[in-house]
């Protein structure tokens, strides 16, 4: 009996000795390769998602933040509405409005919409080429070129647009309703309606020297 137990113990010991050992802990090189591969994947994913512009160069400004409510059978549903303007002060500007239950989420959504609606505007010596009136609904905004050193003569929502677009000398005046979103629409309408000498030459089918 004792001899049989000794034999079984010997077989078990030999089996354990001959069983291959599996190294469950990965090496440091394998860990580094996996981490670098994962980081590269996320970097490429972010680049593909946001390759329309470089957000780091854009400045963001909140023009209007207000609380809104909707009355239903269950009571009032409170939310926040945010109007944001973004621009790089080099001829690119956009704006967005969004609503959410919390202020940070509303701001984030508005900024995303603003970045998705970027417009490229023409700037002539820090101002615009000629006098123009932009319209949106009952809002009208007058834009006039100003000499060097005048500065930005504007306020509120109009100032946010012209400043972040990159204008340094310009006269503006609100001629209608002062609803922030409509004023921004009207200002953008006026800025985009201006005609440079090159555009006028193309419309008239003449060289710039003949204008």
From Swiss-Prot:
Gene source species: Mycoplasma genitalium (strain ATCC 33530 / DSM 19775 / NCTC 10195 / G37)
Family: Belongs to the universal ribosomal protein uS5 family.
GO CC terms, sorted: cytosolic small ribosomal subunit
Domain text: The N-terminal domain interacts with the head of the 30S subunit; the C-terminal domain interacts with the body and contacts protein S4. The interaction surface between S4 and S5 is involved in control of translational fidelity.
Protein known as: Small ribosomal subunit protein uS5
GO BP annotations listed: translation
Keyword Signal: no
NCBIfam families, A to Z: rpsE_bact
Gene Ontology MF terms: rRNA binding; structural constituent of ribosome
Gene (UniProt): rpsE
Keyword terms: Ribonucleoprotein, Ribosomal protein, RNA-binding, rRNA-binding
Pfam families in the record: Ribosomal_S5 (PF00333), Ribosomal_S5_C (PF03719)
């Amino acid at each position: 009996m004792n001899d049989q137990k000794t034999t079984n113990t010997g077989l078990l010991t030999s089996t354990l000795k001959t069983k291959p050992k599996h190294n469950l802990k990965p090496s440091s090189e394998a860990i580094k390769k996996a981490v670098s591969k994962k980081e590269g994947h996320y970097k490429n994913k972010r680049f593909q998602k946001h390759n329309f512009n470089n957000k780091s160069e854009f400045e963001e400004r909140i023009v209007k933040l207000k609380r809104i409510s909707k009355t239903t059978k269950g009571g009032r549903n409170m939310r926040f509405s945010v109007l944001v303007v973004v621009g790089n002060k080099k001829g690119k500007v956009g704006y967005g409005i969004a609503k959410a239950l919390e202020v940070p989420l509303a701001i984030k959504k508005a900024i995303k919409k603003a970045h998705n609606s970027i417009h490229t505007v023409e700037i002539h010596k820090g101002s615009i080429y000629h006098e123009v009136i932009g319209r949106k609904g009952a809002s009208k905004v007058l834009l006039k070129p100003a000499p060097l050193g005048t500065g930005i003569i504007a306020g509120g929502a109009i100032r946010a647009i012209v400043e972040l677009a990159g204008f340094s000398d310009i006269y503006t005046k609100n001629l209608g309703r002062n609803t922030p979103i409509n004023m921004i629409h009207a200002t953008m309408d006026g800025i985009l309606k201006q005609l440079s000498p090159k555009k006028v030459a193309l419309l008239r089918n003449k060289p710039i020297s003949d204008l």
